[in-house]
A protein has these predicted regions:
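Conserved catalytic motifs of ABC-family nucleotide-binding domains
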Residues: 187
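Catalytic Walker B motif of ABC-type/P-loop ATPase nucleotide-binding domains
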Residues: 191-194
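Conserved ABC ATPase signature
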Residues: 166-170
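Conserved ABC ATPase "signature" region
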Residues: 133, 137, 144-162
Length: 340
């Protein structure tokens, strides 16, 4: 019969191997083939007199991906979207949207994009039907064509239960649902979402993201997202972080976390006195006591540290940094209730 010590060693070996495997698996998932570009931006600039709102930024967005644009109010996110969607003229630089050059082929760019603005452009006094019919006519479709285009959105957006209700009477989540449906009427290749869940309660936010997930899965849309909810970047293939008109970081969520945050180790012991010894061994004063365990930041050697102290540690977890940690590291500011 195996001893308790033997069983404990086997437990730690399995758990350490699990964390090492998960780290490699995450890295492998991020490696992919070169993809076609939906958007290519080179040294794009927007100035208002002497003030530079967007300062010579360059990035690209692959077709079919969710691309997240992060930054505080005034960082330049919405200005960038407004330039790429032809609403604002650029000052300098070049950009291509689905192969069409910004400033030279704007009519074709507008055919390729749909935009959900932070503030809705729909009329609160009109019903959902009236709003969508009006918008469809704006694209040059007759009633029959509009209804045909809405057929594909009818079920997935649950339009039937709110079809004849006034827009102003809808809940926040329902309004966003119709805003997205409006932006998809002409079947664009790219959907710009400018702070799509700002002001929504958690349930409505989840509803919006359920619809976005459905669209990504079934329509292969390229989605360009601006947000201040860090958890909304979790599914993004690539993230760009802006501050004061400049790009200060870019990469996959995992790359940014690896580059700008530390892993955290949480261990569980029976006695606080034993944890105090572990903290001394770790050589760090940055820890947090939570009931019966400690949380300590360590950059390297976590698994070695745990193995060395397996006689004291009863269980452990290794927690990666978050996108909130990334933003805090880069800017020294917490991303709380910011937008724009």
């Amino acid at each position: 019969m195996k001893s308790a010590t033997h069983r404990n060693c086997a437990f730690f070996v399995r758990k350490i191997m699990y964390y090492q495997f998960r780290s490699k698996e995450t890295t492998n998932k991020e490696k992919g083939n070169e993809m076609k570009k939906a958007i290519e931006v080179n040294n794009l600039q927007k100035k208002y007199g002497d003030f530079t709102a967007v300062n010579n930024i360059s990035f690209s967005v692959n077709q079919g991906e969710l691309f997240a644009f992060l930054g505080e109010n005034g960082a330049g996110k919405s200005t960038t979207i407004n330039m790429l969607s032809t609403i604002l003229p650029k000052t300098n630089g070049t950009a291509y949207v689905m192969g069409h050059e910004l400033g030279k082929d704007d009519d074709n760019i507008r055919k390729e994009i749909g935009i959900v603005f932070q503030n809705s452009v729909l009329d609160g006094k009109l019903t959902v039907k009236q709003n969508l019919m009006t918008r469809g006519a704006y694209y040059g479709y007759d009633k029959k064509e509009i209804m045909k285009r809405l057929e594909g959105l009818w079920e997935e957006f649950n339009l039937g239960d709110i079809w004849n209700r006034k827009y102003e009477k809808l809940s926040g989540g329902q309004k966003r649902r119709i805003d997205i449906a409006r932006a998809l009427l002409h079947k664009p290749s790219i959907l710009f979402l400018d702070e799509p869940t700002t002001g929504l309660d958690p349930m409505s936010r989840k509803m919006v993201w359920d619809y976005i997930g459905y669209l990504r899965k079934h329509d292969n849309l390229t989605i360009f997202l601006t947000t201040h909810y860090m958890e909304e970047t979790a599914e993004a293939e690539n993230v760009v972080i802006m501050d004061k008109g400049n790009i200060i970081a870019e990469g996959t969520p995992a790359e940014l976390k690896s580059r700008y945050t530390s892993k955290k180790l949480i261990w569980y012991t029976d006695e606080s006195e034993e944890s105090s010894k572990l903290i001394q061994h770790a050589g760090s004063s940055k820890f947090r006591y939570e009931v019966d365990h400690y949380n300590i930041s360590m950059n390297e050697g976590i698994t070695e540290f745990i193995w060395k102290n397996k006689g004291i540690v009863k269980d452990f977890e290794i927690i990666k940094g978050t996108m909130d940690d990334v933003f805090l590291t880069l800017t020294g500011k917490e991303m709380v209730n910011v937008n724009g």
